[in-house]
From Swiss-Prot:
This is Transaldolase. InterPro entries: Aldolase_TIM (IPR013785), TAL/FSA (IPR001585), Transaldolase_2 (IPR004732), Transaldolase_AS (IPR018225). CDD domains: Transaldolase_like. Pfam families: TAL_FSA.
Amino acid sequence: MTTNSNLEALSDAGVSIWLDDLSRKRINSGNLAELISDYAVVGVTSNPTIFAKALSNAADYDEQVRELAARGASVDDAVRELTTRDIREAADIFRNIYEAGHDGRVSLEVDPRLAHDTERTVAEALDLWKAVDRPNLMVKIPATVEGLPAITRVLAEGVSVNVTLIFSVERYRDVMDAYLAGLEQAKANGHDLARIASVASFFVSRVDTEIDKRLESVEGGQELRGKAAIANARLAYAAYEEVFASDRFKALAAEGGKPQRPLWASTGVKDPSYSDTRYVDELVAPNTVNTMPEATLFASADHADVRGDQVSGKAAESQQVFDSLSAAGIDLDDVFAVLEREGVDKFEKSWEELLQTVREQLDQAK
């Protein structure tokens, strides 16, 4: 089979397609390699929710769990060994893509319980980088207030970073500043900037879910349903274009520094009244990443409506959407604060589920 034509058109428009899922079954069965060859997938993202699901219902981990139990590994250590092995093997599958260009990246998240602890986030990120030991790893760090300085410090050590849980353009600007500061420090530390990569994971569908819910109690709110998330992402892209055209970045680019690409995350559609490819179709733009759950990937392969760049030059109309939301009484600052808090809480809960699953598996294996 040749690469799907819809997904090829998406790639040609400058969108790198990453899969927002990973499991040992997907690796061992050859499915991941098949998605690379047939569905234009050039990277993978994982998160605690994905790993909790993978480990809870697959026999593929049994042998390693038995080995871990036999040597008395702690639950925390077992979780790390199980997840880093999957990430390492996925990184090897993507190695050729990585060596050919700027994709082939595989992302692994720091323990989400550290989201508000700068020092421990830095330590964990550096430990993960050493444990996986693959140049195409990206360590995921949340864009919390405490995460921002951690992002800079980890980049300064030459480590590639996927910044996650970004909801507002204001916080995204902080993230880009943290990235540039990290590159500046990495250069001062003697690192090759060309070897450092970063993406900024801007969450999409959750914004519509939260704002649409609030619009239900607003007179005339139906007019604004389903507009916020795409407008938000388009405003973020305008900020990206501005920052990476700046003299500050140009000085880093002259030393091999790369732009921190926007990555559209949370692109699975939650509302069944919307097209299941809307967060793909409407967010096509050069030098972006769209990380898709498998259902969104297959839907896009089947019926994505790829019409070229749908993002550039749309900041003014997107700002009008936000002005209308504010005029309707939607407290956008509160929306983004709630989404960040819920995002961290969701990943913490998944992490606890992951720990509990592995704890039970270790006990059964003894």
